[in-house]
Regions:
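Terminal targeting signals and extreme-terminal segments of soluble enzymes
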Residues: 1-142
Length: 142
């Protein structure tokens, strides 16, 4: 018999919940964001490569990396707090490591969920699984 304290906690927000929220959020459709997967304290979001998201040189524009990281972190937080508990970005630092010329995928993870402040990290990869950006994110729980 397994001790229930060693069992992973069930997320308070599911992939289906995230997809429903995405369908109801217009900016998500404009960006083309997709929910790839999520679990307790983490989420993975995809962003398809689209011409209107590129800069000269044919690489994804910098804010594209930040949008996918911000949304992935938003979902990661909701896996711990549920959808009714809002959290908004108060700080974000992104290191751009290489230009992406393909779809990108970001995995964000809650590092610390405080009573008011949430800290997290995110890593963004291109279609070849090369790390293209790393982000550090801070949110306030509203």
């Amino acid at each position: 018999m397994q001790d229930s304290t060693s069992m992973p906690e069930q997320p308070k927000f599911s992939v289906e919940d995230a997809r429903r929220l995405f369908d109801a959020t217009p900016f998500v459709g404009w960006w083309g964001l997709t929910v790839e997967d999520l679990g307790d304290g983490w989420a993975t979001v995809g962003l398809p490569f689209r011409d209107h998201l590129t800069r000269p040189g044919g690489i994804l524009h910098g804010p594209s990396y930040e949008v996918v990281a911000d949304v992935a972190m938003w979902l990661a937080i909701m896996t711990r707090t549920g959808e009714e508990q809002m959290a908004v970005t108060i700080e974000m630092k992104t290191s751009f490591l290489r230009g992406a010329t393909s779809d990108i995928t970001c995995r964000a993870e809650v590092v610390k969920l405080g009573r008011r402040i949430v800290f997290g990290t995110a890593e963004t990869f291109d279609a070849k699984h090369q790390l293209v950006a790393q982000s550090s994110l801070t949110y306030v729980r509203a």
